[in-house]
Amino acid sequence: MSVISIVPLASNSCLYKSLMSSTHELKALCRPIATLGMCRRGKSVMASMSTSLTTAVSDDGVQRRIGHHHSNLWDDNFIQSLSSPYGASSYAESAKKLIGEVKEIFNSLSMAAGGLMSPVDDLLQHLSMVDNVERLGIDRHFQTEIKVSLDYVYSYWSEKGIGSGRDIVCTDLNTTALGFRILRLHGYTVFPDVFEHFKDQMGRIACSANHTERQISSILNLFRASLIAFPGEKVMEEAEIFSATYLKEALQTIPVSSLSQEMQYVLDYRWHSNLPRLETRTYIDILGETTINQMQDVNIQKLLELAKLEFNIFHSIQQNELKCISRWWKESGSPELTFIRHRHIEFYTLASGIDMEPKHSAFRLSFVKMCHLITVLDDIYDTFGTMDELRLFTSAVKRWDRSEIECLPEYMKGVYIILYETVNEMAREARKSQGRDTLNYARLALEEYIGAYLKEAEWISMGYLPTFEEYFKNGKVSSGHRIATLQPILTLDIPFPHHILQEIDFPSKFNELACSILRLRGDTRCYQADRDRGEKASCISCYMKDNPGSTEEDALNHINGMIEDTIKQLNWELLRPDNNVPISSKKHSFDISRAFHHLYRYRDGYTVSSNETKNLVVRTVLEPLPM
């Protein structure tokens, strides 16, 4: 049993960094606060722990449970040393010039009806152009042009799909599948019945046994389309099974190429665990090796040039924001909390992986800080805190008064101050964007979240295993999705009036589904480690309790089925044609769900961030692209 060692804490060393940048720029506003961190009688409590142990004894004789996790991977000195030349105005001017040139390419496509574009492939060229700018992460510059292109394509859409060009009578699987996916994602009404027309007499998608590049392209786009299925769309389920099988078999026979790399990426990341910036980084490499799209090389090169430049310009922004986050983490006293998982850099990678808009610094930084606080609370309630301490902390959060720290144990005082100041500062930032006070709204969400944590701590303390229904109802709240999303999205320059917020946040179906996916997927990746730490309750164990005789494999199959069904429901809530809430208002919440799904794709990449998650940080945040 390891013993908590006592390390002196220098006087006034715990400083509180301003928790926010403004919406449009980073500001280094610092405010000192006293004795922040995990402090006991003027000293910092440092837990010395081995990954093979589950308990530790503190200096006051309290036996505490500890987690199995590695320390922070990213040294602050390293982060502060990062630099990039791409913040210079000359690069922004070059990007502006390229944006104008790409708009000219779009404009040439819009003249198709006038005969300047070939009537045999103009529809495919419109779709390929939109697909490319979106996957390259530069679509924010061309929203008007994208709408013109999609309106044009949609004007030729039929119940049998479309051909590659406006004068082509026979519909084409490749163009139809690509069009279906892009049109649905942009809110156009399209039905999956179009794919029935590509089946043979046996009810299967008609294709030859040969793995030609053209046929693979068609099946690849069919697979991508199948991933945005709505509930009850059987033809989409069939298309996903068929196309996934076809692509996996094709990968075994075709040589390694840009095509095979694209296939592997789409199979690996699909849609609900795909991070836009990772896709951009990967697709730039793929296009650079000549991809399977139908555009002319001159256009590809122009798009690539802009995409690389934009990637590196944002890379310079990432470095500045990383420095801000790392300073905040260090000066908040968080390093003294050695019993928690320090994943602030990993969370920033997720935030910048789903939002590459330069002016959205406040969103990215808010998301990271809230996720860090969620981690602190998770590790206190799950492992380190005693029941008496947790009840005191829960009561203090409900009263929401800085003076409440006087009733808390020393190590909790700093945590409470960070939480209190962060939530209040985010509310002030949200007021700038939304024009109203949202603090009480955020506090209610936080109280609900803390209450769910306390209930789980009580279950652990009692050794109680709830029913699946009881566990899942509470687990959707304790997943943290709502609390990680709410305040960050309110800092955006997107209006969230009360009626729209209620369609995204609690008690909306959209919020429930996003929380459900995180709870279900998280449990499938964490239940064994949680069980080893003494936490009985998980979706897996509760399912097995409700279904005597069932195995872990049975439970996992059931949970994975629930996840697939829930993803389809979330697709519907985001993209439903009768939606009164714009897709843009729901997109950040939806993308946060994708980011968390990505984190748990193979394992608990949150607790164990030294493998795939570390590679993600390097590939999308630390490394610039060669120009």
Curated annotation (Swiss-Prot):
Pfam families assigned: Terpene_synth, Terpene_synth_C
Reaction(s) this enzyme catalyzes, per UniProt: (2E)-geranyl diphosphate = (1R,5R)-sabinene + diphosphate
Taxonomy, superkingdom: Eukaryota
Keyword Transit peptide tagged: yes
Positions annotated to bind Mg(2+) 2: 378, 382
GO molecular function, one term: terpene synthase activity
Cofactor needs: Mg(2+)
CDD domains xrefs: Terpene_cyclase_plant_C1
Compartments in which it is found: Plastid, Chloroplast
Cofactor, free-text remark: Binds 3 Mg(2+) ions per subunit.
Additional remark text: The highly resistant (H898) genotype and the highly susceptible (Q903) genotype differ in the nature and amount of the various terpenoids found in oleoresin.
Known partners and oligomeric status: Monomer.
Protein known as: (+)-sabinene synthase, chloroplastic
Gene assigned in the entry: TPS-sab
